[in-house]
C-alpha cells in the first residue's frame, strides 16, 4: 500500500501532492485491493494542474497533444478547459473570434438588443406610472458601440482563460488528413491526438439563388449585428425562435416589421398554447405576420429592396404581392452544421442527410477517438447544452468516469420574444404520444400580469403544466409572459427532479407574482 501515496504524488500538481500526504495515514489502514489501487493512481495522475505547453513543432513535424478541440465556441472551450484541469495537454483550433456563435453573433449580443427593445417598450408605459412621457429618439449607433465593446471584452476573457489553463490556440481552419492515426492539418502543419473533438457549431441557412432570385440581397442573423443603423422597413423570413426574436427586437425599436411564415403560426414545434399566443402577441405588438407566405424574388431598387411573395391560403388561389422599399430582408430559416471544409470523408466520419455529425449518447462518432458536441450534432442547439456535453466528455476521457454523459431530457429553454417564453419538458402533444391521452392531464391559466394593471399597453401571461400518469408527475411546463425567462430555471429543477403536481400544490405561493400561478393551478 506504500506504493499508492507515491503513485498519487508522481506527476501530480502541488495541491494533489498535499492531498496525498494528508490521506497517507488513512490509506495505510485500507486493505490492498489491486483494482482500487490502479484506479486511484490513474485518476490522480490525470488530475494534475495544467502545465505550460512545450515549444512549437519543428517544420514538417507532427505536433502531438492529449486532446485537440476543433472550434473555439462555447462547447469546445468548455471541454478543453475542463480537460486541462484534469491534466490533459490540450489545444484549440479556431479561425475566428473566440466564443463562437453565442458570444459573437448569438445569445450575448442578441440579449443586449432584446434588453434595449424591452427598455423601449417600458418607456411607453412611463406616463401610466406617473412619469412624463419620454420622447427621446433612439440612437442605434450608441447601443451598437456598447454592445460590440462588451463582446470584445468577452473575447479577451476567453483568451485569458485559455492562457491561464495553458491551452494552446492554433489559428486557422482544421481539416482531417488521411494519415494512419487521426490527424488534422491547419495552415500546412499537422497535429494529432488520441482524442479529437469536433465542436465547429453551425451557421445560418440561406436560400440558393436558383431557388429565390436575389436571395443573396438579404442578410442573416449574423448580418443583423453588422447593421450600422436601425432599418426603417424590415422583412423577416422564418417562424422559428431566431425569426421571432429578430422581429420583436426590430419592431420594438421602431422599424416597420413584417414576419413572413409558411403556415399560420410561429414556433410550431413548441406547445400549441405557446405557438398560438406568441403569434397573437407579435400581431398585438405591431408586427405584420404574413401567413402562408413565401418569398419568390428579391430585386434591388434605388429606394431599397423589392420583395415579391406568394400567399397560398389553404382552399384559396395563390396571390402574388410585392413589398417595396425594404431596408432589411433577414433570412431566419434555420441553421446548418459547419462541417463543409473538415474533410470528414477522409476518416469516414458519418453524418446525417443534413450534414450533422452522428454521435451516440456519449458524443462518440463512428470513428474511435473522434467526438462531437454542440450545434454540429444537430440536437438541442443551445449553448448550455454544448457546454455541459463538452465537460461531461472531458470527465469521461480524462477522469475515467465511464458513465459521464449528458442527459438530453428536460432541457429548459427560453425564447426572448415579447413577452419572453420559457419551456421545459414535453409538450401536451408529445406527452399524449408517449403516455397515451388517457394518462395525460394538463392545467393552464391565462392572466394579465400585475405590471399591466395600470398601463394602456397590455400583454398576457399564459401557463400550462403537463402531467402524466396517476401520480401526476410534471413532465412539461410552458409559459409566456413578463418574467417567464427568469422564473423558468427553478421550475426546471423541479421537473428534472421528478416533481409531481402535489409537490407544486404543497409549495406556498409568493404573492403577488406571476410565478405563484404555477403552484395554484386547478
From Swiss-Prot:
Q: Which EC number(s) are documented for this chain? A: 1.8.1.7
**Sequence positions that bind FAD:** 74-75, 94, 101-102, 110, 174, 375, 383, 511
UniProt cross-references to PROSITE patterns, sorted A to Z: PYRIDINE_REDOX_1
Q: Which cofactor does it need?
A: FAD
Where along this sequence does the record place binding of NADP(+)?
Answer: 239, 242, 245, 262, 268, 334, 381, 414
Its Gene Ontology cellular component terms are: cytosol; external side of plasma membrane; extracellular exosome; mitochondrial matrix; mitochondrion
All disulfide bonds of the chain are 102-107
* UniProt entry keywords in alphabetical sequence: Acetylation, Cytoplasm, Disease variant, Disulfide bond, FAD, Flavoprotein, Hereditary hemolytic anemia, Mitochondrion, NADP, Oxidoreductase, Redox-active center, Transit peptide
- Which disease relates to this protein according to its record? Anemia, congenital, non-spherocytic hemolytic, 10: An autosomal recessive disease characterized by hemolytic anemia and impaired activity of glutathione reductase. Patients experience hemolytic anemia in response to oxidative stress or ingestion of fava beans.
Sequence similarity: Belongs to the class-I pyridine nucleotide-disulfide oxidoreductase family.
- Give the protein name, as stated in the record: Glutathione reductase, mitochondrial
Gene of origin?
GSR
Amino acid at each position: 500500500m506504500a506504493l499508492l501515496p507515491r503513485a498519487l504524488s508522481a506527476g501530480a500538481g502541488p495541491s494533489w501532492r498535499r492531498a496525498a500526504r494528508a490521506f497517507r495515514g488513512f490509506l495505510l489502514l485500507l486493505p490492498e485491493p489491486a483494482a482500487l489501487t490502479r484506479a486511484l493512481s490513474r485518476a490522480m495522475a490525470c488530475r494534475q494542474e495544467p502545465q505550460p505547453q512545450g515549444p512549437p513543432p519543428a517544420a514538417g513535424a507532427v505536433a502531438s497533444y492529449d486532446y485537440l478541440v476543433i472550434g473555439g465556441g462555447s462547447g469546445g472551450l468548455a471541454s478543453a478547459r475542463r480537460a486541462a484541469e484534469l491534466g490533459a495537454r490540450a489545444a484549440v483550433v479556431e479561425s475566428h473570434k473566440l466564443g463562437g456563435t453565442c458570444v459573437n453573433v448569438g445569445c450575448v449580443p442578441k440579449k443586449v438588443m432584446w434588453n434595449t427593445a424591452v427598455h423601449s417598450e417600458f418607456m411607453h408605459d412611463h406616463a401610466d406610472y406617473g412619469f412624463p412621457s419620454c420622447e427621446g429618439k433612439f440612437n442605434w449607433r450608441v447601443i451598437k458601440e456598447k454592445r460590440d465593446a462588451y463582446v470584445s471584452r468577452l473575447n479577451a476573457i476567453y483568451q485569458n482563460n485559455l492562457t491561464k489553463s495553458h491551452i494552446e490556440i492554433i489559428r486557422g481552419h482544421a481539416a482531417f488528413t488521411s494519415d494512419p492515426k487521426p490527424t488534422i492539418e491547419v495552415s500546412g502543419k499537422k497535429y494529432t491526438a488520441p482524442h479529437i473533438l469536433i465542436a465547429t457549431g453551425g451557421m445560418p441557412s440561406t436560400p440558393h439563388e436558383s431557388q429565390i432570385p436575389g436571395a443573396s440581397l438579404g442578410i442573416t442573423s449574423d448580418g443583423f449585428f453588422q447593421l450600422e443603423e436601425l432599418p426603417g422597413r424590415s422583412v423577416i423570413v422564418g417562424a422559428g425562435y431566431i425569426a421571432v426574436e429578430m422581429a420583436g427586437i426590430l419592431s420594438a425599436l421602431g422599424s416597420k416589421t413584417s414576419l413572413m411564415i409558411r403556415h399560420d403560426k410561429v414556433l410550431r414545434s413548441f406547445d400549441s398554447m405557446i405557438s398560438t399566443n406568441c403569434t397573437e402577441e407579435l400581431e398585438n405588438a405591431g408586427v405584420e405576420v404574413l401567413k402562408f407566405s413565401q418569398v419568390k424574388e428579391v430585386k434591388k431598387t434605388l429606394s431599397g429592396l423589392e420583395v415579391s411573395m406568394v400567399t397560398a391560403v389553404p382552399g384559396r388561389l395563390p396571390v402574388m404581392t410585392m413589398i417595396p422599399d425594404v431596408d432589411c430582408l433577414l433570412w431566419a430559416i434555420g441553421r446548418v452544421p459547419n462541417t463543409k471544409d473538415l474533410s470528414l470523408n477522409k476518416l469516414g466520419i458519418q453524418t446525417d442527410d443534413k450534414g450533422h455529425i452522428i454521435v451516440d449518447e456519449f458524443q462518440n462518432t463512428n470513428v474511435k477517438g473522434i467526438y462531437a458536441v454542440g450545434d454540429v450534432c444537430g440536437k438541442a442547439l443551445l449553448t448550455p447544452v454544448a457546454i455541459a456535453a463538452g465537460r461531461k466528455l472531458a470527465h469521461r476521457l480524462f477522469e475515467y468516469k465511464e458513465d459521464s454523459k449528458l442527459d438530453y431530457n428536460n432541457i429548459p429553454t427560453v425564447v426572448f420574444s415579447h413577452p419572453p417564453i420559457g419551456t421545459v419538458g414535453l409538450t401536451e402533444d408529445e406527452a399524449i404520444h408517449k403516455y397515451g391521452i388517457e394518462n395525460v392531464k394538463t392545467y393552464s391559466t391565462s392572466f394579465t400580469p400585475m405590471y399591466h394593471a395600470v398601463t394602456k399597453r397590455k400583454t398576457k401571461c399564459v401557463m400550462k403544466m403537463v402531467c402524466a400518469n396517476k401520480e401526476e408527475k410534471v413532465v412539461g411546463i410552458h409559459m409566456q409572459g413578463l418574467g417567464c425567462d427568469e422564473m423558468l430555471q427553478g421550475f426546471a429543477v423541479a421537473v428534472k427532479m421528478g416533481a409531481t403536481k402535489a409537490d407544486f400544490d404543497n409549495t406556498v405561493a409568493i404573492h403577488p407574482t406571476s410565478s405563484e400561478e404555477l403552484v395554484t393551478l386547478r
